[in-house]
Amino acid sequence: MIEWTILSSLASALLAGGGTYLVYKKVSNANYKIHLEKAKARARAIEHEAEMILQEAKIRAKELEIGAKSKYENETSKVIKEYESYLIKLEKQEAKNQQRLERETQQLEEERRRINHKQASLSGMIEELEKLKGDYRSKLTESLEILSRVAGLTQEEAKELALAKATEESRAQIAQIVRKYESEAKEEGRKRANYILAQATTRFAGEFAAERLINVVNLPNDELKGRIIGKEGRNIKTLEMLSGVDVIIDDTPGAIVLSSFNLYRRAIATRTIEALVEDGRIQPARIEEVYKKVEQEFEEKVLEEGEGIVLDMELGYVHPELKKLIGRLKYRASYGQNALGHSLEVANLAGVIAGELGGDVKLAKRAGLLHDIGKALTHDFGGSHVDLGAEVCSRYKEHPVVINAIFAHHGHEEAKSIESAAVCAADALSAARPGARREVLESFLKRVQEIEKIAMEKLGVRQAYAINAGREVRVIVNADLINDEESVLLAQEIAKEIETKVQYPGEIKVSVIREVRAVEFAK
């Protein structure tokens, strides 16, 4: 009975296990099919995505191909245009060379005709001298015979007497011939010089604009005038002390005026005020910050301008410091004539004159551009612009012809070359043009420069600025070297020396400014 029960239980268990297995198998098969379908769907999705990526890649490749083709066409077109431009330049240069060749050929032909004319003249003179010699011999023989017959002289005595008389007559005739040909030579030289100067002045006509002593800064509104003045005048005092420029604020609507004989200071002050107006923040610390930034920008600007001029004139290598000084000539005037404009005019005229005389055109232009380079230094250093220019050009190993031209254009030396002589002639032409220079203005500028120089020579002086049309000089001293009592004595000393050395109308106010700043940082 028990065995039967066990067997029944085992059979039931087997039947139950088999049913469970069948159910599990069916479920597994169903899950497999589901997973299989999902896998197929994923595979189809991946395949579709791959097709999309491939399609996008083909489109992208097509776009890149089109872009590359377009870029290639653009670059090719650019190269073709550059080549065409280069060919045009070559053609123009060839035309210029051809014109120059024709002009030089014409000049050579004229020179050949002139030489032939001189040779013919010399041949005529030789024939005339031979004729004179023949006449002299015949007259000598005749005189000897007459003297021997009439005076009873020996032949030797008669010969000496006749020789003395013939020599005197010959000298007079020869002197007359020499004077004649000297006169012709001088006239020929004068005509040649006039021709060269005419060629130079007609081939180069420079513009001229007289420099002024003021700059006008336009303001968006008159409210800014009060902000520029600042509380108790602090802003305007800071600006005037930094720049050495007289800031004039009057009833003129929408404008203020900056006055100074120094164009460079005035230009920096003008740009500083324009930058402050654009920025809107106007107070002493900001004014100092903007002024230093503008000053640095101008240092870079003058170097760029100098480099551009040297490049345009094709002068080759020029020392960077000389380029900077060339750029600073733009902010320097002499007798109301802009120094850079004058130097460029002299350079071009000197090149033309040297070319006509058979000299080195490029060297003449170089000497002409640098002949007044010392004027860029006269505001900062004492002495003649000739000596300063020669010194700085010697320091930077300039050509001896350049240094000779610097000395020669003011008569300190004789011109030792065609190029130096061309610079001297060009300088005289540029300066002598009607209206090119103003003597009264130059005498005023020299006076205010002398006033500043007297103040700057004193121990402890950091800066000195002549303002108010030279009626006041502001002297900024080093507070560590000069105390308050010494400031009073310094003002008296400067005033006394100005009275002794400078001629001026009215009176000059000497203001010594001693500023002490204590700076500490909270950490």
Swiss-Prot record:
| Protein name (Swiss-Prot/TrEMBL) | Ribonuclease Y
Task: Name all HD domain ranges.
Answer: 339-432
Q: So what does this one do?
A: Endoribonuclease that initiates mRNA decay.
At the top level, the lineage of the source is Bacteria
Q: Does the keyword RNA-binding apply?
A: yes
Q: Name one GO molecular function term.
A: RNA binding
Q: Mind telling me which PROSITE patterns this protein's record contains?
A: HD (PS51831), KH_TYPE_1 (PS50084)
Query: Which SMART domains does this chain map to?
Result: HDc, KH
Q: Which organism is it from?
A: Wolinella succinogenes (strain ATCC 29543 / DSM 1740 / CCUG 13145 / JCM 31913 / LMG 7466 / NCTC 11488 / FDC 602W)
SUPFAM superfamilies noted in UniProt:
Eukaryotic type KH-domain (KH-domain type I) (SSF54791), HD-domain/PDEase-like (SSF109604)
Q: What is its main location?
A: membrane
The EC number on file is 3.1.-.-
